[in-house]
């Protein structure tokens, strides 16, 4: 299926796992075993999730190996309850990566003011990171520099940076979903056909415009001396994700 469908990796989140665990009896035996062993709810949840993620990493390992580490990653996010706690985010990211113990694992960290310092520190530890919740060009630029700072810190320790990968989950589709809704609301109260036509013409295009601006900023960054120095040591470029449409219309 991976080959036939061209699947190059998988992401996950607590909502996906909640739906899978609550709606599938295959987890019941492991849950009952955890209860019998006196494990807490969190311990049972993590044992189920870590196993699923580890198995997924193994399934996609051939993709990871065949592409030289460009594809084949499985993402798992740190608990949303610590999104505003840099230190906890760092420690949980390291704990997750150590517990699952797969080189094609990516840890999802939100690109918030508290999350970006964690991104740099986790990258410096040699852990792959998927930076999420990026909606603006500014947030993308900040993420790129956080990634670079993490690579620089690791290189300064004399450790390799050629096997570290990072993805910027720049949520293009969600921008259009929200902006289009605002445009639709405004169109109801506009009588001028010229103005209406201009607004209609913008629908579905704001996110792409945002991405084009971000790409120009990306080119400036990779043409700079700091990135060139890292690239010479084998650093991988920061990639995009989440460009697919979400508007059901």
Where are these regions (language model features)?
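Catalytic beta/alpha-barrel core
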Residues: 104-112, 128-137
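Conserved small/polar residues in nucleotide/adenosyl-binding loops
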Residues: 240-247
């Amino acid at each position: 299926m991976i080959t036939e469908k061209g699947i190059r990796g998988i992401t996950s989140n607590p909502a996906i796992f909640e739906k899978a665990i609550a709606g599938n009896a295959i987890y019941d035996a492991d849950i009952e075993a955890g209860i019998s062993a006196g494990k807490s709810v969190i311990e049972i949840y993590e044992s189920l999730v870590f196993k699923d993620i580890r198995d997924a990493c193994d399934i996609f390992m051939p993709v990871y190996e065949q592409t030289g580490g460009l594809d084949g990653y499985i993402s798992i996010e740190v608990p949303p309850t610590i999104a505003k706690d840099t230190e906890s985010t760092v420690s949980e990211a390291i704990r997750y990566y150590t517990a699952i113990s797969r080189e094609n694992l990516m840890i999802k960290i939100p690109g918030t003011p508290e999350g970006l310092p964690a991104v740099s520190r986790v990258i410096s530890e040699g852990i792959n990171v998927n930076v999420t919740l990026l909606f603006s060009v500014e947030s993308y630029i900040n993420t790129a520099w956080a990634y670079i700072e993490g690579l620089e810190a690791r290189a300064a320790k004399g450790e390799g940076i050629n096997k570290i990968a990072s993805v910027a989950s720049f949520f293009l589709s969600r921008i259009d979903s929200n902006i289009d809704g605002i445009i639709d609301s405004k169109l109801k109260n506009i009588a001028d056909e010229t103005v209406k036509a201009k607004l209609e013409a913008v629908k579905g295009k704001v996110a792409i415009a945002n991405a084009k601006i971000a790409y120009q900023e990306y080119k400036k960054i990779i043409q700079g001396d700091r990135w060139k120095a890292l690239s010479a040591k084998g650093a991988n470029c920061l990639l995009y994700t989440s460009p697919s449409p979400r508007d059901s219309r």
